[in-house]
Amino acid sequence: MANCFVGDIQGCYDDLRRLLDLAEFDPANDVLWLCGDLVARGPDSLNTLRFVKGLGNRAVTVLGNHDLHLLAVADGVAPLKKKDKLQELMEAPDRDELLEWLRHRPLLAEHPDLPIMMVHAGISPAWDARTARNCAREVESLLRGDQYQWLLHNMYGDQPDGWQDDLVGIERYRYIINTFTRMRFCYFDGRLDFKCKKGPKESTPGLRPWFEQREHHVDDPILVFGHWAALMGNTGKQDIKALDTGCVWGNSLTLWRYEDDALIATPCPTYAK
C-alpha cells in the first residue's frame, strides 16, 4: 500500500487523473492524501469533487481557503466570481450532497500509524502539535454542526494576527482558520502576514516563512502542506513537504509518495497565462 500526497488541484481534474496514472495510483490498495483547495480557478471543480468523494476512505483531504470560500458562496455569504469557475458546480444536481461532504472534511489530518500530519497552509509557530490538533477539532466541530452558517458569515478578516491561549469566540476561530488555510509568512514576533504571496527570497523585509519561525522538536511528525505555489516545493527541510507547485498557474501538479520518498509531477501548461 502506498500513501500518495498531492498539492492544490483547484479544479484541474484532468491533470489530477494524469498524475495518478503516472504514479500508478491504485485505489484498491493505495490512499490519496490531498492538501486542500480541491476547487476554484481550474476548469472542472465539479468532477474533481465527485472523483475525490467517490474514492471514499481511500482519499483523505483537508480544507483549504478556496474550499471554505465555496461553502460561503453556496450559503450566500460571498459572491460567486467568474474567475473561480464554480458555476457548473453550483448548478449541479448533486451540489448539496457534494457540499455536505466537503463541509465535513478536516482542517488537519494525520496518518493513524505513520508520523505524518497534513494541513492546507501551515501550523502556527505559536502551537505545538497537540495544540494544533485541538484547535483543528474546535473549528471542525463548528463546521459540522448547527453553527456552521454563523462561522461562514464571520470567518473573513485578518485579525487577530497573533495567538493567545485565552482567545475566545470568533476571534479564536478566525485565527485558527487563517492559520490552517491562509498563512504563508510571519513577522519575527510571530504575528501572521496575509499580504505577501511571493517566495521567501522576494518577500517583504521583516517576514519569514511560517515553517522557519516554528521550533523543531525531535518527535515532530513530517508536515505536508500546499497553498504556497511560489515555494515550488522548496522548504529546505526534509520533514516539511510543500506540494503546491502551481498547477492552476501553468506550472505542475506534484505528488509525493511516502514509501519511497518519490516526487512525481505532471506539467500543466494549459493554464499558463
UniProtKB/Swiss-Prot annotation:
Segments traversing the membrane: none
Reaction equation(s) it catalyzes: P(1),P(4)-bis(5'-adenosyl) tetraphosphate + H2O = 2 ADP + 2 H(+)
Record flagged with keyword NADP: no
EC number of this enzyme: 3.6.1.41
Gene Ontology molecular-function annotations: bis(5'-nucleosyl)-tetraphosphatase (symmetrical) activity
Alphabetical UniProt keywords: Hydrolase
Pfam families given in the database record: Metallophos
Family: Belongs to the Ap4A hydrolase family.
Cited NCBIfam families: apaH, PRK00166.1
Protein name: Bis(5'-nucleosyl)-tetraphosphatase, symmetrical
The gene coding this protein: apaH
